[in-house]
Amino acid sequence: MMESGEALLKKLDGRLSGLRGRLTPDTGMDKITWFRAGGPAQVLFQPSDEEDLSAFLKAVPEEIPLLVVGIGSNLLVRDGGVPGFVVRLSAKGFGEVEQVCDTQLRAGAAAPDKRVAAAALEAGLAGFHFYHGIPGGVGGALRMNAGANGVETRERVVEVRALDRKGEVHVLSNADMGYAYRHSSASPDLIFTSVLFEGVPGERDDIRRAMDEVQHHRETVQPVREKTGGSTFKNPEGTSAWKEIDKAGCRGLRVGGAQMSEMHCNFMINTGNATGHDLETLGETVRARVFENSGIRLHWEIKRLGLFREGEQIEEFLGKII
């Protein structure tokens, strides 16, 4: 069991007094994540801007755990909470999207992906329509090379601006990001703050039509009005995660308040009162059944974080097969 957030702040004894952002101890992560489940952040920090974030990083000892979140999609928080600091990049300080030249946009890491798509439409830049259908933010898209409809984030990235744990600025090229399918090999200690994107001049009517098609597809096949973190598992090579989940009989499967969506069975939903334990147990049950059925090991696309409550540890594949 972790100590209180107030106790952690007291240990730092005024080192954070010059910050302009908001420090909130013992904040429920269920208020932040799209699953609306999970335990508290020991301390939540919402920096005002990149300068404020840099000052915070310089003040916090590196041995204190630190986790960065954006708009809260694609996150499953365990019920024991998240120790140390959770840094939430706010839309006010990190959510702007602006056109910087004929073919380029600069976007803050907390900007919703849909805002990037809208800005690209306004600028007459093609190649961003896929963001209109991704329920997440730019920072997460950069970290996991988010993609949809046959397009990936890496195809649009020119350079990424980031801070390290010492508060120093780094500028990473596309190659530095080390992109692969739903993955970047950039150091996990780097905090992305903004990105420079490159688009292709296009006709606004064509761009709008592509965005409408993405939106229609999403509303037709995905549970967009449910409490969900998006796609639960990465697609295995040569097949789709949802197909393997369906073949294993897991469509609609429930654990407590968690359920694999009837509409799209690679989407896990909180039906109303799911705990982090319910959600993760459901996910590991699905992994076990898929492996038993087809020999395929599904890998989580949703990021799981935090501590288990005492006695609620969950083994991979529920310990059945590994």
UniProtKB/Swiss-Prot annotation:
Key words of the record: Cell cycle, Cell division, Cell shape, Cell wall biogenesis/degradation, Cytoplasm, FAD, Flavoprotein, NADP, Oxidoreductase, Peptidoglycan synthesis
Pfam families registered for this protein in UniProt: FAD_binding_4, MurB_C
InterPro entries: FAD-bd_PCMH, FAD-bd_PCMH-like_sf, FAD-bd_PCMH_sub1, FAD-bd_PCMH_sub2, MurB, MurB_C, MurB_C_sf, Oxid_FAD_bind_N
E.C. numbers: 1.3.1.98
Annotated coiled-coil segments of the chain: none
Gene3D superfamilies: 3.30.465.10, UDP-N-acetylenolpyruvoylglucosamine reductase, C-terminal domain, Uridine Diphospho-n-acetylenolpyruvylglucosamine Reductase, domain 2
SUPFAM superfamilies the UniProt entry points to: FAD-binding/transporter-associated domain-like (SSF56176), Uridine diphospho-N-Acetylenolpyruvylglucosamine reductase, MurB, C-terminal domain (SSF56194)
ATP-binding keyword on record: no
Domain FAD-binding PCMH-type span(s) in chain numbering: 36-202
Gene Ontology cellular-component terms listed: cytosol
Entry annotated with the keyword Cytoplasm: yes
Reactions accelerated catalytically: UDP-N-acetyl-alpha-D-muramate + NADP(+) = UDP-N-acetyl-3-O-(1-carboxyvinyl)-alpha-D-glucosamine + NADPH + H(+)
An example molecular function term from Gene Ontology annotations: UDP-N-acetylmuramate dehydrogenase activity
Source taxon at top rank: Bacteria
Active site feature: 182, 231 (proton donor), 301
Family: Belongs to the MurB family.
Protein name as it appears in the record: UDP-N-acetylenolpyruvoylglucosamine reductase
Organism: Brucella suis biovar 1 (strain 1330)
